[in-house]
Every structure is written in C-alpha cells, then in structure tokens.
Amino acid sequence: MKIATAFSLADCAEQAAFETSRALHGQLGGAPQLLVLYATEHRAEPALVAALSAHLPGAQIIGGTSCAGVMTEKGFHCGPDGAVGVLGLVDPEGAYGVGASALGDDAQAAGATAVARALVAAGRDFEIPTLVWCCQPPGCEEGVLAGIQSVIGARTPIIGGSSADEAIAGAWRQFASEGVLQDHVVVAVLFPSTRHGAAFQSGYAPTGLFGVVTRAQDRQVLEIDHRPAGEVYGHWTEGVVGCDGAGAILAMSTPTPLGRVAAEVQGVPMFVLSHPALLGVAGDLSLFTDISEGDVVHMMRGSPESLVKRAGLVIDDACAMGGWRGADSLGGLVIYCGGCMLHVRDQMDEVVEEIRRSMPGAPFLGAFTFGEQGAIVDSCNRHGNLMVSALTFG
C-alpha cells in the first residue's frame, strides 16, 4: 500500500485539480485506486471533480465539503479562495469501491443502497468489508448508519464525517465520481491488504452533572428529570447558556456539550457527545444527534488545550488498535469536528503538530465536519458531535 496527500489554495477548480493530481501522481507513480477529497464550499464545483477524474483516471472518489479549511501533514490549509485536500491510496492487493445514493426521505434506505453499490464497485458483492468510510449531509446520520449495517452487519467499523459549510446555511455538499452531489450518501468500502486501526473519541470529560431525558422527540430534548431541558442545562452551565433567552447557542455550548456513555473500557466510560444548537422558547434543546427518552445525559467540559491534544491521542489509539507504533504508520484520515476547529482555530497548527508527533513522517488528510462517525472500541458504530474520528494504516 502507498498513501499520499496533496492540497491546493488555487483560485479556480481546474488549477486546484491539476496541482493536487500532479502531486499525487508523482508520489504514487500513477493514479490512486481510491481518492478521498475534501474541499471548502468555495471549491465545491463540478469542474473540480471532473478535472480530478480526468487527471486520475480510474480513481474512485469519495468526500465532501469541510468547514473553513483542510489539514494535511504539511499544515492547516485555508485561504480566501477556499482549500482543497486529497488523499490517494494505491493497494494492488486490496479492493476498494465507492457508491452513492440520493437521501430522499429515507436515510436508512439510502445508506443501504450506497453501501451495496460500493460493494459492486469493489467487485466484492455480498461480502463484508473490512472498513467503511462515509459522507452525508448533517441531520440523517443515525439512519445512514442503520442502513449500512442492515447490509454488512454491525461489526464492521464505519468511519467518516458529515459534510460542512462555513455558516450552517446548507451549502454542504458530497463528492463522488459522479460529481458534486447535494443531499446524498456516499460510502466507500475498504478491503485493505495492510493492517488498519480506528479510534473515535472526544476531548471532553464529564463534570459529574447528569440527568435522565424524560421527554424527547427526534433531536429535541424537551425535559431532563421532568424539568425543561433548557432550564436544567442553564443551571448546569451556571447561566452561561440561556442567559440571553431563546435562540442559537451553538458557539456558547461548544465547551459544555452533553455526553452519553456508549461503552466502557476496563471500567472507564467512553462518551459520545451531542452538541446543543438551539434553545427553544419552551425551554427545549435542539441537538445535532438523535436523543431518546431514558437516555442519561452528562454535562461534559473541554478546554482549548484538551481539544488541541485530542487529535494526536486519537491517532495514538488508532495505531495501537492496529498493533503498530505510530512511527510505522503508512498514513491516515482524520475527521475533526468543525465546531471544535472553530473553537481552537488560532491553534490549528498545534493540532497538526500533535498528529505529526503521533505518526511522524506519515501522510494524512483531515476534514472539519458537522457530525462525526466512528467505532467505539467494541466496534459499536456511533454518530456524535465535537468528536475526533481517525483511520490509520500500518
């Protein structure tokens, strides 16, 4: 297996495609089998995908829009004309396929269709892939995961992120060989010939404050412990959230999301987070994940320092899960929450440096998403917010 990355800050899609494809071709000695593509909304143009396909014939493309920039082992990349980042993978002894499906009104069906098409593209119909990489718009993630698992089962790690934009205005898009897509699920199935490792964590810790969701609907928490959810959350945050009344609370709630225990490792709880986005006039909280009555929610807290260090620690865990030292890594993919990135934007060079320390010399591509998907240690696939999800090869 060979892995290479490239980026471009060019002011036109065709030039960005030329620069990145030329760099990949030079490093890999030809076109990759799998091309992972992330770009800011400014560069989400059909011409970008068309030019990449022309320059790298045969490469199967998967990816989506990334909030404000991308990152590689060369640094954090953003510019006035947007940014493009690519990772190319060559693995003659492995198999890879990408499939896409329109979301429609049934996310589960779209996830099932996309993964079935990906298996056909890989030439591995009806087999269970080693890994799955996914990209979809925000808001449908649990359904997409359920659909993928309805085809391949629940034991295959599903890793990825929900496409993002700059202003939470719906400008997010998905990428596949067909072009720039809107409201689609794009799935890659991976049968790598090398070792692999995956990890899914956050940079937050529980505060000791928790409650039971006693009323909920889809992605709204109406009551916690039979009290208005906003009132409880406002008390937990000591009035920081809710002091201005109803409205958007996304930025102010970033340091204090809600967490649910997804699994335990040697008695240590592993949390998946939900980011409160809106405080309703009736005291309800709207999240970026589904929530159910009976869920126990913990108020979590994270600092800029913990968010900066977490990406490297997740890479460490992914390599350990794969059974090799970070220095022996061939490369990897990193999904880093867009909200966390905005919270520590001035320190993104430090985030990149933490990843470099964890797998020195290895290429990687990172995107900033509005929802993260990953596998907890027992291969329990989950969707969360404010998380870091990583896939490494060694």
What is each stretch, according to the model?
Residues M1-L34, Y38-H55, A59-R345, D349-A362, ...:
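Small-residue-enriched flexible segments
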